[in-house]
């Protein structure tokens, strides 16, 4: 659902566990040899600056190794993923991020950002300008419009050529 999810399996294909991340966000950089018992990854979210973690594959624990200098406390913000219906009834995911404690009553300024094209996936990533927006009481909303790569080729084709109107309908429905 447009956020990183990692499931660990044995070399025989048996499910071991799901990797837990510090929140809804994007992780990358996993790698290693078959004999390694740890790996490193980068994690970032709307409220978490890029951070490097060490993941122990034996215990399933992640340990923060390094975080960028951006002055942001992820605990000060709330990030959630919701789903809404577009004009044609298609279920579309959207991330909503804001400062913790803000009442979402329709009176908050909202920055609605979307892109639905060229099979490009929009995932939760850190941005200092979005963080400043949320610090000042703004709400950041990012729908995953058809045309992107979040759900594979069918989702991508659903927002291209003769289906391009779906991208605009998805965005309007998000508002």
Predicted regions and their residues:
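A short beta-strand motif characteristic of beta-propeller blades
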Residues: 15-20
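Repeated scaffold domains used in trafficking and secretory/extracellular systems
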Residues: 25-32
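Cap/lid segment of the alpha/beta-hydrolase catalytic domain
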Residues: 14, 57-61, 65-175
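Short acidic, glycine-rich loop/turn motifs
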Residues: 10, 45, 86-88
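Structural motif
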Residues: 2-8, 47-54
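Residue-level signal for short segments within beta-strands and strand-turn junctions
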Residues: 8-10, 43, 54-56, 98
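Short beta-strand elements that form the blades of beta-propeller/WD-repeat-like
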Residues: 1, 35-45
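Peripheral terminal and inter-domain segments
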Residues: 1-2, 66
């Amino acid at each position: 659902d447009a956020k990183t999810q990692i499931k660990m399996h044995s070399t025989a294909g048996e499910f071991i566990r799901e990797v837990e991340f510090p929140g809804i966000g994007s992780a990358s950089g996993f790698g290693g040899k078959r004999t390694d018992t740890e790996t490193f990854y980068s994690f970032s979210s709307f409220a978490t600056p890029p951070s490097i973690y060490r993941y122990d594959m034996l215990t399933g624990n992640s340990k923060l190794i390094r975080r960028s200098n951006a002055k942001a406390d992820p605990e000060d913000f709330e990030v959630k993923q919701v789903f809404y219906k577009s004009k044609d009834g298609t279920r579309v995911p959207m991330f909503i991020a804001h400062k913790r404690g803000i009442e979402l009553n329709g009176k908050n300024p909202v920055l609605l950002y979307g892109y639905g094209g060229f099979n490009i996936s929009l995932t939760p990533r850190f941005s200092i300008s979005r963080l400043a927006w949320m610090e000042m009481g703004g709400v950041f909303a990012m729908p995953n419009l058809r045309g992107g790569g979040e759900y594979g080729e069918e989702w991508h084709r659903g927002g291209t050529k003769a289906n391009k109107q779906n991208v605009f309908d998805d965005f309007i429905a998000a508002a």
